Amino acid sequence: MKSRIRLLRLSPLDEVEFIAAARRSRALHSPWVAPASTPAKFEAYLARMSQPEQNAFTVRRRDTSALVGVITISNVVMGPLRSAYTGYYAFAPHAGQGYMREGLEAIVRHAFRTMKLHRLE
């Protein structure tokens, strides 16, 4: 079955849609996460996720390109350990429809096949 999503690196072009989605999803996210909901916060998040040990990916619907959520691979340690952490959140109204599950499956493949990690927590 063809994936319903595409993973793309977070970029400055995502700012307007990301902020709108974060604002629309406040009730969904509170109190667990607080995605960037202002231009200044988005720019700071993008700068942090642009560091070599940080990676942020948007999860987008393949059919409409709508922003579904975000998945991160962070605190990447290379060398013998080759380890990282992952985090994710969906945006309303896409939560609960399986898009993030597909995104996580794709990010795990990326982490182990492309990044050659040994461990993902």
Language model features with spans:
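Conserved acetyl-CoA-binding loop-helix of GNAT-fold acetyltransferases
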Residues: 89-90, 96-113
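GNAT-family acyltransferases
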Residues: 1-93
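Conserved GNAT acetyl-CoA-binding A-motif
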Residues: 114-121
